[in-house]
Amino acid sequence: MAVCARLCGVGQSGGCRRRQQRKGAGNGPELEDEEEEDEVRIEAEVIGGQAAEAPRRPRSLLHLPPEILVEIFSSLPGTELPSLAQVCRKFRQILTTDTIWKRRCKQEYGVCENLRKLEVTGVSCRDVYVKRINPRVKSGRFMKILPDYEHMEYRDIYTCLLHQYRHILGLWQPDIGPYGGLLNVVVDGLFIIGWMYLPPHDPHVDEAMRLKPVFRIHLMERNDATVECMYGHKGPHNGQIQIVKKDEFSTKCIQTDYHRMSGGRQEEFRTWLREDLGRTLEDIFHEHMQELILMKFIYICQYDNCLTYRRIYHPPSRPDDLLNPGFFKGTYGSHGLEIVMLSFHGTIAKVTKITGDPNVPAGQQTLEVDLTRPVQLPDVEHLRNFDEMSRLILDVQAQIHREQRQTGNEEDDGRGAGPDKAEHSQQPAPVLRPANEDANKVDGGDGEEQKPPNVQSFVLPTGVMARNEEYPRSCKMCFYGTGLIAGHGFSSPERTPGLFILFDEDRFGFIWLELKSFSLYSRMRDRFQQSEAPSVEAFEEMLQNMQSWTT
């Protein structure tokens, strides 16, 4: 925009001074149109101190062919185009060209749908409806509630839909008490849709995530964006979206009767149990699990008409990270599968809950791994012994406590470390190395299988509970870590020792020593746009705020 202004000669250095001089000379407003054209004159180039003669070249942007101006304006950010339209009347006319706004919609928001195709082919309209509005439609009445694309332009899409609701695009965590969640608001064709990410059914941690639409925004008519709630089984209905403050917005359903089912709460509970958890009442034998599931259903029903969302970011990555940070789904015993976020902070890896449970709610740091404390696993036969595994972990914990007491005593005495101690404290952190080759052999008689140098055999110790037996039988590295446990209502929280196991780039596990339990985590392979944190400081601040959202 600034470049165009300089080329046009507007501002204090060009047309504005001429306009002020003419007004001072008594010129009336009838000359404004002529002045606008004067303001877009391009100054002659000066080469070697003399004006370069170019009699056949355009001397102003107004003399350029319209298609070239369209190409120039199409490359500018959409937020700058309204200011450009104020330069002169011809610019305003050119900016009504829909090609400009079509390119801005595609480059800034990824809109690839063709409005003109949608208006002439009913099949495309039906595809749009079935895919994004109501996947259960079976009748031919869908045309009655489709947007009026025939009289719509890309400028309407950009200004009244994409630009107006740009602040809600990205990742969000709903405020549903301890349960949390993961919402991804994206531009999907000519719609803005909020997709709630649900873990696969327990215990299939390696399966893909399930997506459930929560709300959608689109233009039913020009200059009129419509917000619709997608809860329930009766199709989309009226809703509202309010941007509360920066990085926070809320949704409200206007027609909550669309959420109700003819069979009452019992039918709603059975449907929710089948769709969200993949279970039936007959599958749940344990009374404690029945209480947990019923409690979650009652809690969620209280938020089906109004929800508040807070922005979260994808964790930043560095080249020296142990593995790529991101979102994972993990097993948490009777609580089922939950979504967590792995992030790295120097020599510490943190795993934060995105979804939670009544014991440890969403937003809390479920795991903390000390990457300077690698643990060398024994061979498979000794690894099956839980006491041997426990001894390895507790030895590392005891060493940490001794170092902490030693540091505390030195601070209390008011003395710095001696030469020997100072030399010890300045030693670099242990090198993160894979297990040695002696531990990489699997018993097999003469036909022993030799594993790669950076991989060793792994098996869960006897007595450690796992949701299923489909866990990797080899790992790359192991580290000492702590896990957060608490009573119901997040009472008496404490960190207990455990073992972090890195299986591969997409899977890791954690053995909870005190609980004799094993959690397996698998990476979410979904790609999230507009989810990067503006800075590392902003991400750290978000992590701190998340812990206060649910406490």
UniProtKB/Swiss-Prot annotation:
Keyword Lipoprotein: no
Record's compositionally biased regions (Basic and acidic residues): 414-424, 435-451
InterPro entries noted in UniProt: F-box-like_dom_sf (IPR036047), F-box_dom (IPR001810), FBXO31/39 (IPR045048)
Location relative to the cell: Cytoplasm
Annotated GO CC locations: cytoplasm; SCF ubiquitin ligase complex
Similarity comment text for this entry: Belongs to the FBXO31 family.
Free-text note on domains in this protein's UniProt record: Zinc-binding is required for the structure of the protein and facilitate folding.
Designated name of the protein: F-box only protein 31
Upper taxonomic lineage: Eukaryota, Metazoa, Chordata, Craniata, Vertebrata
Gene: fbxo31
